[in-house]
Amino acid sequence: MARLSIAIQGESKMHKTEVDLVPAACVLDELSHTDGQPSERVMPIAILGATELSQDADGVCTTRSPHWDVRAYVDHGIAGTTRASCAIVSPPTMAPLRFSQLSGDLARIVERGCRMPTHSRLISGSANSECLT
């Protein structure tokens, strides 16, 4: 399954996490609508790249592409991609997103059963939160 590496700049350090590609689409879409913000605003999330096991499982492929906003990323069929090639960066004018907010939103969305594979679980509550398979 394809995985996304996400980095969020906190006040004192950069927080990184990795999530499965399919639930990430739902999480990113939900986060772009948090706190009553207009739907056209995108939360400041940076996805540095995506990794996925190659067809023959001999290695891992890492790719990067031009920056897209969350909505464009989801609109391009994140759940249907077989070869991940995407990156998301927020507009510089937006306020920083607290990692604790991402962790809480991830937990809430996963609890609602948002396309999270049954073999995955969420560990939250710290800067090391991540979805593990």
From Swiss-Prot:
Keywords: Nodulation. The gene is nodK. This is Nodulation protein K. It comes from the Bacteria.
